[in-house]
Amino acid sequence: MSALITHDRSTPVTGSLLPYVETPAPAPLQTQQVAGELKDKNGGVSSQGVQLPAPLAVVASQVTEGQQQEVTKLLESVTRGAAGSQLISNYVSVLTKFTLASPDTFEIELGKLVSNLEEVRKDIKIADIQRLHEQNMKKIEENQEKIKETEENAKQVKKSGIASKIFGWLSAIASVIVGAIMVASGVGAVAGAMMVASGVIGMANMAVKQAAEDGLISQEAMKILGPILTAIEVALTVVSTVMTFGGSALKCLANIGAKLGANTASLAAKGAEFSAKVAQISTGISNTVGSAVTKLGGSFAGLTMSHAIRTGSQATQVAVGVGSGITQTINNKKQADLQHNNADLALNKADMAALQSIIDRLKEELSHLSESHQQVMELIFQMINAKGDMLHNLAGRPHTV
């Protein structure tokens, strides 16, 4: 408060008037209320403390896992869209600046912006086409490798098939030759006839298979005729083998039994004459032993020859059969590999067809984008031309009527 100065009073010393200064009255003391203190009805401070309003119900609620997941997804979407939002904000700021400048500038910048967006979309489509083209080229390279493997397997299958045919023909011819020898020598006529029949059936089976490969016999007929001929060939081979081994064993037993019976009868006859003439008995025993030795030697020689012939024929058949079985197994393995490679090749062709369809679709979309971009640019040019015509008409009107 400023002091009040008056000139009404004078001093007795000089008689001149001196200014009178009034001092302000002291202000009454007031007690300040501290935040949080409550007064009662008499004006005193209450000691109950601060009374706050009850919290809202939303404060006591807890966030569930679903809400947390939604918030997380929202944050991720915001993060992903940050770059796009920045790009859009830049475009919007540019458009806003040119909007405030002039309509013509805005239209020009709008056309440039649309053109840039179309170029970006076109670049994306071209990148997709290039990526799919690279994948297609990789598939083509894989298919070429598969084709080479298939060709090599086909050559190996052809070679193994030729080897199997050679062994098959050799087995059939050997069976016919050995059977003919057995029939001609009289060692085993029945078994030899069976071997000849088995060889003939084998050659017929090979001829039928060759005709089927050449296309002279249909596949449906071969499905029925092939197993029948094979079964007949196997049956005749088994029968001829059993008869060969069985005939040799029975013939050996019969020869041995006959020779033993003859020797026993000779010894009994010479023993009855022993009481008459000792010299004659000695001579008869020596003659009988010599005759028995001669006959047994001839019999064993015949048995050895027949056994050698049959053993040789059977060994030849076994060797040829083993070779034929090995070549047939190799041929089946090569054919299985060839079928596997053909399946892989067909799968790769299907993948290539799918990729080609995707590339064709992208090309169509790219052409549609080019057409839409051209339409938008034509529309913008029409708008600019229409505005130019309108301004020209306005400029050509008279100022006064």
UniProtKB/Swiss-Prot annotation:
Answer whether the UniProt record assigns the keyword DNA repair to this protein: no
InterPro entries, sorted:
BipB-like_C
Chain coiled-coil ranges = 129-160, 345-379
Q: Where in the cell is it found?
A: Secreted; Host membrane
UniProt lists the family membership as follows: Belongs to the SctE/SipB/YopB family.
The function of this protein is: Component of the type III secretion system (T3SS), also called injectisome, which is used to inject bacterial effector proteins into eukaryotic host cells. YopB/SctE and YopD/SctB are inserted into the host membrane where they form a pore and allow the translocation of effector proteins into the cytosol of target cells. Is an essential virulence determinant. Required for YopE and YopH translocation. Shows membrane disruptive activity in vitro.
Protein known as? Type 3 secretion system translocon protein SctE
Q: Which organism is it from?
A: Yersinia pseudotuberculosis serotype I (strain IP32953)
Q: Give the taxonomic lineage as stored in the record.
A: Bacteria, Pseudomonadati, Pseudomonadota, Gammaproteobacteria, Enterobacterales
Gene this protein is translated from: sctE
